[in-house]
Amino acid sequence: MRRHPQTATKHLFVSGGVASSLGKGLTASSLGQLLTARGLRVTMQKLDPYLNVDPGTMNPFQHGEVFVTEDGAETDLDVGHYERFLDRDLSGSANVTTGQVYSTVIAKERRGEYLGDTVQVIPHITDEIKRRIMAMAEPNADGRRPDVVITEIGGTVGDIESQPFLEAARQVRHDLGRENVFFLHVSLVPYLAPSGELKTKPTQHSVAALRSIGITPDALILRCDRDVPEALKNKIALMCDVDIDGIISTPDAPSIYDIPKVLHREELDAFVVRRLNLPFRDVDWTEWDDLLRRVHEPKETVRIALVGKYVELSDAYLSVIEAIRAGGFKHRAKVEISWVGSDDCQTDGGVASALGDVHGVLIPGGFGIRGIEGKISAISYARSRGLPVFGLCLGLQCIVIEAARSVGLTEANSAEFEPGTPDPVISTMADQEHIVSGQADLGGTMRLGAYPAVLESGSIVAEAYQSTKVSERHRHRYEVNNAYRDRIAESGLRFSGTSPDGHLVEFVEYPPEQHPFVVGTQAHPELKSRPTRPHPLFAAFVKAAIDYKEGELLPVEMPERVSNGAERRDQVGQSIPEPANRG
């Protein structure tokens, strides 16, 4: 009788060594895509060793974006990679942090569930980690179990914070049997230019550190800026005691969407299914090859300005970037991102310099007052020139503030930025007021996750979605103040989508006869975009940018309101010269 009967679900762990930011998440995502293309059901999970319960309150400059799942969990940005490569929605259980694990264990101790035991890292913390790992193998809503669970272990081998997670993974292999668990280790093979050599010692030491805690990797991903020669692969296989078929060279790829092809060329997917005795078929490249043609063979190029507060770290807008690029794939267009700090747009000269040669302006989400006037100035500049504008979350709120100021509410602002403003056109949501006032925790308390919306028939957004009923993910505490709807509408801005009860403004836009494309959404549609299924709003935005570039649109006439609300019309194009380089 087998001591470890084959399980219905196999587990594959991805760890990293030598250095951080080697691409463990993209490696895991790409392998997941390959196994999915072989007909297997795959789900993924990220284990994060930090003590935060979730990244929701972390500084974007430190952590990057917060990826919100359908069920409202604030998760690591790698979960976004998982969803995009697998083309499936994941839940909050796809991200486990040390903070979550310790919170659960301490709560159990307070309830007396450990019956007087001394609570320790082993077994109590590791058992809780194992419970969360094994929960990923449970049947989903349709009663089907995944064939493979891919679990990425954050951090680097040797970090103190990662040790409980690595120990838990080791125990999973012990509990389920070696034939049911696979360890993949991502390591750096640096190239020393002065000597012209690739060095294998860092990888050997990284694997030695992993083996010292009881884990022998089944395969190694060798990260390098060039291909690793066969002779060095053989040396690494010998010194690290890894099958030569499991030594995978992964030089830097032109695009992240090329990585599945790189891994397949090295036959990693075949090695995994053979080792885990998985049923499989040949890889179906139909959809992915079409994507790669769109990535590498664009028919045109457009420039989109991303006017944000955190542009020094592109990871703060990772899903936004991928969604814009996917919108370009839809139209066989390459999207070049022009990174614009919103602080740089606060003066007329600054905004003209930053946006003078772009074909579209995207205003992403964010928090806090810094840079807000620059975002509003960018919207005014774009409106006066027929330049397409797309606002996300805070971007919608800035569009509304700009519209309100244009009809005489010169002190219009958000309660977030100016609590004492006489015209709070953006107000705190009723169920968030006690949180904003400091009477409750900030973490995990925003309006989070998927919510439905009803769109106005014939609107730009309804035409883009090809539907009047949609659902999008959210992450916010503030909303359009309904007391100002009628006054704001005097600017021409339409409230083209609301919550089903009509209370919460979800989408705004200017009619095409007033401006070709100014659209804002309170949601974060970038979180649902896929490279093979671009989000319709991003596709529509990129199409508007293409039309702007091709049409060389003339400036539009805008009504200007003086402080008493009276209207004065100026032909903007007569007073402000056209940008010199639009193509």
Swiss-Prot record:
Amidoligase domain: region residues: 1-278
Mechanisms controlling activity: Allosterically activated by GTP, when glutamine is the substrate; GTP has no effect on the reaction when ammonia is the substrate. The allosteric effector GTP functions by stabilizing the protein conformation that binds the tetrahedral intermediate(s) formed during glutamine hydrolysis. Inhibited by the product CTP, via allosteric rather than competitive inhibition.
Can you name the source organism?
Answer: Mycobacterium marinum (strain ATCC BAA-535 / M)
HAMAP family the UniProt entry points to: PyrG (MF_01227)
Protein family (similarity comment): Belongs to the CTP synthase family.
The active site of this protein is located at: 393 (nucleophile), 524, 526
Q: What is this protein called?
A: CTP synthase
Which PANTHER family did the record assign? CTP SYNTHASE, CTP SYNTHASE-RELATED
Does the record carry ATP-binding as a key word? yes
Q: Which residue windows are transmembrane per the record?
A: none
- Function text: Catalyzes the ATP-dependent amination of UTP to CTP with either L-glutamine or ammonia as the source of nitrogen. Regulates intracellular CTP levels through interactions with the four ribonucleotide triphosphates.
Q: Which GO terms describe its molecular function?
A: ATP binding; CTP synthase activity; glutaminase activity; identical protein binding; metal ion binding
Entry binding sites for UTP? 20, 199-204, 235
Annotated spans, Disordered:
559-583
Keywords, alphabetical: ATP-binding, Glutamine amidotransferase, Ligase, Magnesium, Metal-binding, Nucleotide-binding, Pyrimidine biosynthesis
Entry EC no(s):
6.3.4.2
